[in-house]
């Protein structure tokens, strides 16, 4: 092989090695020039160089990727998780509830809806709507579990004592 041909082959080998070992797509590799070099070469020096360099590395480029994937899949996941729910609710008010103050909160006797708090009904519908704001309350329910209730746009209807949430 001539010195300039040897240098071209060396550059081609380095390019192939870099792309192959970096696990990059080889679409942009100059395959036509590689095929031409292989056809023009009287002996298989180029193939020998490629095989020797490949054998010297002793690993395939994707072996490390498969090892990392296996470690990731075999890792134990935590059983602890968090869930969140958006609940819409409508609470029917009973006359047996105890009210405190002229515009204080209410606490229904013996019910999980005791977690909710609201304002005493105001005289006009516009005042009732203006006084409502998004609120959230948390506490123990009748089952002994913690409950979180979020209310929004709450205002009492005039005659039925139903609270619309």
From Swiss-Prot:
One of its GO terms (molecular function) is methyltransferase activity. Keywords: Methyltransferase, S-adenosyl-L-methionine, Transferase. Its EC number is 2.1.1.-. It holds the Pfam family FAM86. GO terms for biological process: methylation. It comes from the Eukaryota. Coiled coil: none annotated. The keyword S-adenosyl-L-methionine applies. InterPro entries: FAM86_N. The keyword S-adenosyl-L-methionine applies. Belongs to the class I-like SAM-binding methyltransferase superfamily. EEF2KMT family. This is Putative protein FAM86C2P. It comes from Homo sapiens (Human).
